[in-house]
Amino acid sequence: MAPPKTSGKAAKKAGKAQKAISKDDKKKRRHKRKESYAIYIFKVLKQVHPDTGVSSKAMSIMNSFVNDIFERIAAEASRLAHYNKRSTITSREIQTAVRLLLPGELAKHAVSEGTKAVTKYTSSK
């Protein structure tokens, strides 16, 4: 048995009614926020080179780099805490992890900047 035929206008009206119902029933979808270090990377760039810009692709690469380094430091600090039978990762573990992961002069600068940041944080409390 063939389905009943409807005129073109009737089909359009039925379609519009269907759309109106489905539009009202659907809730507005919220976009999930993507966390990024982009604003912080940009602030540092402007401190170092105020007249220099950065492309979105370069910013994405820098963001991936920061995430990768943080992951490596966290993993190394976790390993160090485990070796020493500690359940807490302190600034000491982070400092040792940085010394192990970063080469030479870069490690020295990172440790001094980290120490400065921790001192500033504890003095503000």
UniProtKB/Swiss-Prot annotation:
Gene3D superfamilies with a match to the protein in the record: Histone, subunit A
Annotated stretches, region: Disordered: 1-33
A molecular-function term among this protein's GO annotations: structural constituent of chromatin
Chain positions of cross-link Glycyl lysine isopeptide (Lys-Gly) (interchain with G-Cter in ubiquitin): K120
Name of this protein: Histone H2B
Reported function: Core component of nucleosome. Nucleosomes wrap and compact DNA into chromatin, limiting DNA accessibility to the cellular machineries which require DNA as a template. Histones thereby play a central role in transcription regulation, DNA repair, DNA replication and chromosomal stability. DNA accessibility is regulated via a complex set of post-translational modifications of histones, also called histone code, and nucleosome remodeling.
Family listed: Belongs to the histone H2B family.
Presence of the UniProt keyword Nucleus in the record: yes
Pfam entry (one): Histone
Species this chain originates from: Chironomus thummi thummi (Midge)
